[in-house]
Design a protein with these regions (language model features):
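Short, acidic Ser/Thr/Gly-rich low-complexity loop/linker segments typical of extracellular
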Residues: 95-113
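Short amphipathic, basic-aromatic surface patches that mediate peripheral association
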Residues: 63-82
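Short coil-to-beta strand junction motifs in C2/discoidin
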Residues: 79-88, 124
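Bacterial Sec-dependent N-terminal signal peptides
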Residues: 1-25, 64-65
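Alpha-helical segments with a strong preference for the paired helices of cellulosomal dockerin domains
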Residues: 165-171, 185-212, 216-242
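Extracellular beta-helix/beta-solenoid repeat scaffolds
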Residues: 21-61
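Structured interaction patches on ligand/partner-binding surfaces of diverse proteins
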Residues: 107-108, 136-170
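Short Pro-Gly-centered beta-turn/loop motif in secreted/extracellular proteins
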Residues: 112-127, 135
């Protein structure tokens, strides 16, 4: 059970407190005062008021990653913008078997910018960033990304070398931009005939709305989605990972 301590401005003097499988919640008051040398320990601490004193409060910290990722089919080179959508990012160890350390999802803006929050990372430790999108090729960062003072930044869009194996599509020349390959509708790591067939079937049935077969994000499954996927299938696009 996750331990959460809610602290909402309550006047109290503590010598030491550690909660296990419980919640400590204070609803009213003015401040939390901790005696010198006292400790508060929990898995998560949410502070809405203030505290003073010489002790420590220990809880899991939030690690913030500012990410920039473009999606090939969703990107419009004439406006240098894209249709916003959700991606999930996995933090992975740098060494085989590249175990997943944590994951977080965010909504990418029209500029491809999103903010992710992780709780199981560590400052100064390098992690691969494994990007997943509903109909794009799984793409990893070229090298390890670390957090400094709980913050990190990574931009996949400014160079092909930002992706492991240089595995992205160039979607603009001025400014130079790169994006995740689109068309992996069934998320098997390949853009191939099976993806084309899925799109063809949905297009034939006039499917609309938020669907994996909508490769360009316009909420219509039609020829434009087929063309993007067919071209990447013909180029044998697939995921490239360590």
């Amino acid at each position: 059970m996750k331990n959460i301590i809610y602290i909402t401005i309550f006047l109290l003097t503590l010598t030491a407190i550690t909660y296990s499988q419980s919640v400590m919640e204070f609803e009213a008051g003015s401040a939390l005062t901790i005696d010198s040398g006292a400790d508060i320990s929990a898995d998560e601490i949410i502070m809405n008021g203030t505290y003073t004193g010489g002790g420590t409060i220990n809880g899991n910290s939030a690690y913030v990653l500012n990410l920039t990722v473009l999606i090939e089919g969703f990107y419009n080179s004439s406006t240098d913008t894209m249709v916003g959508d959700t991606v999930r990012v996995y933090l992975r160890n740098l060494s085989s078997p590249y175990a997943i350390v944590d994951s977080s999802a965010c909504y990418l803006s029209s500029s491809g910018i999103g903010t992710l929050i992780f709780s199981n990372a560590f400052n100064g430790t390098n992690y691969y960033l494994d990007i997943r999108h509903r109909n794009s090729i799984e793409t990893w960062s070229a090298a390890g990304q670390s957090f400094t003072s709980f913050f990190g930044t990574y931009d996949f869009s400014n160079a092909n070398s930002q992706a492991y194996g240089n595995n992205m599509a160039q979607v603009n020349t001025s400014p130079v931009k790169f994006a995740l390959f689109s068309g992996d509708v069934n998320q098997d790591g390949f853009v191939e005939l099976s993806d084309v067939v899925l799109i063809y079937n949905d297009a034939s049935n006039f499917v609309t709305g938020y669907a994996n077969t909508d490769v360009n994000g316009d909420n219509l499954i039609d020829l434009s989605d087929l063309l993007i996927t067919y071209n990447n299938s013909s180029a044998f696009v697939s995921k490239v990972t360590p």
